[in-house]
Regions:
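Short, surface-exposed, charge-dense and proline/glycine-enriched linear segments
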Residues: 1-5, 45-55, 120-129
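Double-stranded beta-helix
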Residues: 14-86
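Non-heme Fe(II)/2-oxoglutarate
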Residues: 34-38, 75-80, 84-139
Length: 139
């Protein structure tokens, strides 16, 4: 799985950029340190819709081994990253928006089997994208 993050607003060090632990995709699936109860109506994590399945100790160790990066850029920028790259964001405490659209193109036979977030955070629609005709915008 590859992910694309499209910045709809400028992303700066002040408005909570997504942080990445570079190279962690090479580790494959990192086993979670915690088990969360699910909220039935959302199928999400009970403690926090965007909570981490990893302890602070695990995250600290991985950052010490691999470093930490927080891509920033103007609206319209796109960041591509492997789905197994450890990533997350702090809350945006600034007065400036930080709207980012995440897109995860993937084969339909490789879909997520246990969604962890409500649709308003991560839409779980696994229908195949249907191609349009070449003249779809002019006809």
């Amino acid at each position: 799985v590859i992910n694309a993050a499209l910045f709809l607003d400028d992303v700066t060090e002040f408005n909570g950029p997504t942080m990445f632990v570079p190279g962690t995709h090479k580790l494959g699936m990192i086993p979670s340190d915690k088990n969360f109860d699910r909220i039935p109506e959302y199928g999400r994590l009970a403690e926090d819709a965007i909570g981490s399945p990893y302890t602070n100790e695990t995250i600290d160790r991985l950052i010490k081994e691999h470093g930490l990066a927080a891509p920033k850029g103007p609206a319209g920028s796109v960041v591509f990253f492997h789905g197994c790259t450890l990533h997350g964001s702090a809350p945006n405490m600034s007065p400036w928006n930080r709207t980012i659209v995440f897109w995860s193109p993937n084969r339909t036979d490789n879909k997520i089997t246990a969604p962890t977030r409500p649709d308003f955070l991560a839409l779980q629609d696994f229908e195949a994208v249907e191609p349009l005709t070449d003249d779809c915008l002019t006809s």
